[in-house]
Amino acid sequence: MAQTKENNPAPRAKAPAAPKAAAANGTVPAGEKHTRPTTRRPYYNRRPRRAQQPKEAATPIHIYPLGGLGEVGKNMTVYECNGDMIIVDCGLVFPDSEMFGVDMVIPDFTFVVQNKDKIKGLLITHGHEDHIGSIPYLLQKFSLPVYGTRLTCGLIKNKLEEFGLAGKTKFVEIVPRQKIKLGCFTVEPIHVNHSIPDAVAFAIDSPAGTIIQTDRKSTRLN
């Protein structure tokens, strides 16, 4: 009798074994790949991060613009830190056509007169009238040393002679890059280019930080 060969069915592929569970300490068994979940937490469910607030200076500095802020002319700024004050510029502004009978407009000196014992000096950036024009009227209230470059001091002296104040005022001639110590302030004059010679800006260093004071149209020279 002829023998017949049975048709055996093809072997089925084995189902992939289930991945072994991770150990209690979070390690993955040898031979297994560590996969990250594909689902992510919706953005709106995330906890918002608190914005970092700027750190306040341990020693604050106060700036009082008595003129020249939002206007052209009458430049005068007072800086206060650690109980010390300095003044930068003391100018005037000429009246417009609607100010009949007014020759000039000067800053209100009430604040500086009330704090005259704290003021260490008056620093002048350059010799334009909107920066030096009110100095005689301030020095009539009380005396204080005036710091400026050679040309600037010369222009101020000529102005003070008309008021009889030139011999009563102490002038300190400053040179760019030579620092001046006034109370807690250290002021460095910086040579700048302006429409009048011998103009400077000031780098005013204090325990609260450094501030650059200059005229609005000045540009630095290297």
Question: Residue spans of the language-model regions?
Answer:
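Intrinsically disordered, low-complexity RNA-associated tracts
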Residues: 1-55
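His/Asp/Glu-rich metal-coordinating catalytic cores
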Residues: 42-123, 128-220
